[in-house]
């Protein structure tokens, strides 16, 4: 595979990963959020395989395997189970409505292009075209966290944010050392478990996973 073709494929893959994050903004179903995260992680795992093959870095194959096991199989399954247990099916009243959310997300991606333009122009890596998309994914993940009321949606936003960081690290360094990615996975799993306990406590106290209910604890 020549560098030109690889550059196009890496940019296409990054575009698909970013596209799945927009599902979190234009859909209300929590099940759709989990499915979008699962497919996003699967595409990201495929990108790790592609970069590992071209860069002759077998460690990236292990990273891809971890992505498939942890983020495509284990975490989405737990999220589906959590959704059924707490009875949360829809993000009915987000802080920011859907049309406005999509506009803001588009502006965040444009901001990412503006911020990363000097880096893209200075880089000689064939993966440089996907750098703005990775930064845009991080911005969108952050926006999901702050613009949605359901704790479960915010958990998915956090996971999407971590996918953006992984994508940025892979495209920006042309690969990630296995030990670094293992450390990141451990942090993500610990954060996910803590958030799961947090959601159970919110639901047990308020019979809802709307984080706005936490305002009742004031005073």
Describe the residue ranges of each PLM region.
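Alpha-helical transmembrane segments of multi-pass membrane proteins predominantly involved
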Residues: 1-219
């Amino acid at each position: 595979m020549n560098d030109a073709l690889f550059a196009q494929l890496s940019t296409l893959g990054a575009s698909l990963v970013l596209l799945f994050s927009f599902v979190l903004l234009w859909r209300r179903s929590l099940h759709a959020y989990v499915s979008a995260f699962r497919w996003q992680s699967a595409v990201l795992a495929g990108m790790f395989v592609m970069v590992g093959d071209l860069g002759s870095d077998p460690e990236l194959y292990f990273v891809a395997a971890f992505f498939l096991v942890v983020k495509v199989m284990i975490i989405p399954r737990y999220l589906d189970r959590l959704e059924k247990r707490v009875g949360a099916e829809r993000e009915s009243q987000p802080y920011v409505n859907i049309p406005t959310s999509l506009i803001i997300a588009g502006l965040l991606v444009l901001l990412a292009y503006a911020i990363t333009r000097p880096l893209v122009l200075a880089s000689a890596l064939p993966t440089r075209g996907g750098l703005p998309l990775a930064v845009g994914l991080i911005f969108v993940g952050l926006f999901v966290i702050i613009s949605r009321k359901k704790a479960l949606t915010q958990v998915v936003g956090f996971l999407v944010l971590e996918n953006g960081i992984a994508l940025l690290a892979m495209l920006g360094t042309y690969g990630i050392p296995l030990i670094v990615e293992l450390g990141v996975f451990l942090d993500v799993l610990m954060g996910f478990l803590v958030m799961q306990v947090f959601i159970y406590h919110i639901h047990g106290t308020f019979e809802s996973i709307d984080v706005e209910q936490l305002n009742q604890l004031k005073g």
